Curated annotation (Swiss-Prot):
A zinc finger (FPG-type) spans 242-276. Its cofactor is Zn(2+). The lineage of its organism: Bacteria, Pseudomonadati, Thermodesulfobacteriota, Desulfobulbia, Desulfobulbales. Keywords: DNA damage, DNA repair, DNA-binding, Glycosidase, Hydrolase, Lyase, Metal-binding, Multifunctional enzyme, Zinc, Zinc-finger. PANTHER family: FORMAMIDOPYRIMIDINE-DNA GLYCOSYLASE (PTHR22993:SF9). The active site is at P2, E3, K59, R266. This is Formamidopyrimidine-DNA glycosylase. Involved in base excision repair of DNA damaged by oxidation or by mutagenic agents. Acts as a DNA glycosylase that recognizes and removes damaged bases. Has a preference for oxidized purines, such as 7,8-dihydro-8-oxoguanine (8-oxoG). Has AP (apurinic/apyrimidinic) lyase activity and introduces nicks in the DNA strand. Cleaves the DNA backbone by beta-delta elimination to generate a single-strand break at the site of the removed base with both 3'- and 5'-phosphates. One of its GO terms (molecular function) is zinc ion binding. Monomer. It comes from Desulfotalea psychrophila (strain LSv54 / DSM 12343). Its EC number is 3.2.2.23, 4.2.99.18. Belongs to the FPG family.
Length: 277
């Protein structure tokens, strides 16, 4: 599943290719995504509109139109975005496309079809967008994401720390890969209760999460199976994994074997010596 770094990389790659372009027509494969594809509304209200800017909120990408309408995309498990010449044959799992005024097509490809595309019409878009985002936590690379915020958010909770930082109501965009890597960098066992985390550990964890995410963005994201950027290229942060997917391999710090167990239903990787429970 694309996490924050992958979505950010896609946004950065797509933005210069579609901003300033006008949507000429929209279309779809007829196969349903996680939500029904609003093709009638898009054909009526988005055609003829200029794309003015793109924004990311967590794992959502918002495409703003010049009349105030907003197209909101979530990539789900296997979603990909790209821009192609209209003459180029569409791929098997291209389920949505926008024809642009420069004879290019902006295409959404999704093998497993767990992603979603919403259209927020002008006049209601801001209200609907705020409703969509109101339960999301802060951006981990934003100013409000601090150790004090994490400590306060953990009050009264008994979650494992890994489940806590993967909860989008607490903080957005941190999936399984970056939760594992951040906790290893912070030397915190993923199964520890949030109530056991000391203030200095909150400070270290907040810092490590930001460092890991920024490093991943610099590396173009992580390509495990499906992720490619807007130009079809792969990320290479996976070459920097310290624990994720490395069960029984030596810890890069102490050389002891990396362990793995299910926490919150997700595979968790950690060094039992460097990350004590």
């Amino acid at each position: 599943m694309p996490e924050l770094p992958e979505v950010e990389i896609i946004l950065r790659g797509i933005s210069p290719l579609i901003c300033g372009r006008t949507i000429v027509a929209v279309g779809g494969s007829g196969k349903q995504l996680r939500l029904p594809l609003p093709l009638p509304e898009l054909n009526r209200d988005a055609s003829g509109k200029e794309i003015t800017r793109l924004e990311r909120r967590g794992k959502y990408i918002s495409i703003f139109l010049n009349d105030g309408g907003i197209l909101v995309l979530h990539l789900g498990m296997t979603g990909q975005l790209g821009v192609f010449p209209k003459e180029q044959a569409r791929a098997k799992h291209d389920h949505f496309w926008c024809r642009l005024d420069n004879n290019q097509e902006f295409r959404y490809n999704d093998t497993r079809r767990f992603g979603s595309i919403r259209f927020l019409p002008a006049g209601k878009s801001r209200m609907l967008q705020e409703s969509l985002y109101q339960k999301l936590g802060p951006e981990p690379l934003g100013e409000t994401f601090t150790a004090d915020y994490l400590r306060r958010a953990a009050e009264g909770k008994s979650l494992a720390i890994k489940n806590f930082i993967m909860d989008s109501h607490i903080v957005v965009g941190i999936g399984n890969i970056y939760a594992n890597e951040s906790l290893f960098k912070a030397a915190i066992h993923p199964a520890r209760s949030v109530q056991s985390i000391e203030q200095e550990e909150w400070e270290k964890l907040a810092r490590c999460i930001q460092q890991i995410l920024l490093h991943a963005i610099d590396c173009g994201g992580s390509t495990i199976s499906d992720f490619v950027n807007a130009k079809g290229g792969q990320g290479y942060f996976q070459m920097n994994f310290k624990v994720y997917g490395k069960k029984s391999l030596p810890c890069p710090h102490c050389q002891g074997p990396i362990s793995s167990e299910k926490i919150g239903g997700r595979a968790s990787f950690f060094c039992p010596s460097c990350q004590r429970l």
